[in-house]
Amino acid sequence: MSPQTETKASVGFKAGVKDYKLTYYTPDYETKDTDILAAFRVTPQPGVPPEEAGAAVAAESSTGTWTTVWTDGLTSLDRYKGRCYRIERVIGEKDQYIAYVAYPLDLFEEGSVTNLFTSIVGNVFGFKALRALRLEDLRIPPAYTKTFQGPPHGIQVERDKLNKYGRPLLGCTIKPKLGLSAKNYGRAVYECLRGGLDFTKDDENVNSQPFMRWRDRFLFCAEAIYKSQAETGEIKGHYLNATAGTCEEMLKRALFARELGVPIIMHDYLTGGFTANTSLAHYCRENGLLLHIHRAMHAVIDRQKNHGIHFRVLAKALRLSGGDHIHSGTVVGKLEGEREITLGFVDLLRDDFVEQDRSRGIYFPQDWVSLPGVMPVASGGIHVWHMPALTEIFGDDSVLQFGGGTLGHPWGNAPGAVANRVALEACVQARNEGRDLAQEGNDILRQAGKWSPELAAACEVWKEIRFDFKPVDTLDPNDKKQRDNEDTLADKLFGDKG
């Protein structure tokens, strides 16, 4: 390591300002297994060298400030400082760089996503020397991961609780999201569950408003759950949104849900905050409740390509903080989400170990050391014609959630639920028989529609509904090139040998 990167205790204090790169840019640094690693997309102001910009990020998100201070001599900056250890130019983007920063583990409180984010993204995003800054990815080391409980239960425990295997789970968000009375709301829940869905859901902004107070909603939804269970012989659930203005009120609602005996509750983890979410996840683990997570407000943070926090980071944070489900986009619906990027963070939610794969936006390998997985929830502008693609993209360990695609059925809520259940069962059966859902999906649905009038009616209503808009957040050209090279190699190895 070059001498200028080291803090020498023997050197007397010299007041003044010096370049960040003299202390915080360390290209010879070898990362440790215990380091938290971050990949930042940095857009410096004109005239600011990329090394200085990367070093400024490392400094301002760890031990540094704008000037030298006397108290630097009272500690070991070499032990505690963040280090920018690599910078690479983003091909195809003007003045954008990926700056890699390593943080010593001792900088962070154990088991606290709140402290992790306060340090890494808390202040540096307003730094004047940067035009824009985005946190693209984090590597959470096993030593830090082990300080978190993570999801209350995880995928396998949820399947065992529900006694549902071998297929994605089906859900529906009750619409209109605001304005229904508690009794009419409960009626819609019952009709959807009775028609064949596994779950129904409160929308993210359903809390406790004048038209429907939370306690009334909980009671009528519990009645709908028990009635539909008795009639179908299946375990059912409704995501009762416990999000509230205070943690005390949130936990009071969770307690009431537990007393009703329902299987699952819900939280808006970004608007509610990581501290509240972690507290609720601990309560759910201790009291046998599943926890559904909505990501309301995420696009404010993650949608712009050059500034903010990528959703893969927010997904990792949720797995640490705790949740059994989280909304992940659909690829095919009305909400933002490129296929390869979405599949990348879906793997980060579910798998125990994920390899580095820049073609899917994954900058670092991630070892979750047996932390339970989280089910991705595909929701937003989807209907029966999307079922083959959703089944292929997300696989069995997912929740496919049709709001308007259930409640918008021309014959009513229950027939809408029937249509979705029949479509899912047909796609799963076809997949298990070895059929190609991508190529034969429409034919599979048409065949199933011949013996299900509910599905046939749904197919007719939504046959021309598409959301053909290009995503804003896409892979960089150099990452796409890696994907293209991998596809070319695969064609050479496994292509048609006829």
From Swiss-Prot:
Residues of the site described as Transition state stabilizer: K334
Region (Disordered): 471-498
N6-carboxylysine modified-residue sites: K201
PTM statement from Swiss-Prot or TrEMBL: The disulfide bond which can form in the large chain dimeric partners within the hexadecamer appears to be associated with oxidative stress and protein turnover.
Binding site for Mg(2+): K201, D203, E204
Database matches in Pfam families: RuBisCO_large, RuBisCO_large_N
Gene Ontology CC: plastid
N6,N6,N6-trimethyllysine: residues carrying this PTM: K14
Catalytic reaction equation(s): 2 (2R)-3-phosphoglycerate + 2 H(+) = D-ribulose 1,5-bisphosphate + CO2 + H2O; D-ribulose 1,5-bisphosphate + O2 = 2-phosphoglycolate + (2R)-3-phosphoglycerate + 2 H(+)
Subunit structure: Heterohexadecamer of 8 large chains and 8 small chains; disulfide-linked. The disulfide link is formed within the large subunit homodimers.
Protein name listed in UniProt: Ribulose bisphosphate carboxylase large chain
Organism (species): Cuscuta reflexa (Southern Asian dodder)
Lineage start: Eukaryota, Viridiplantae, Streptophyta, Embryophyta, Tracheophyta
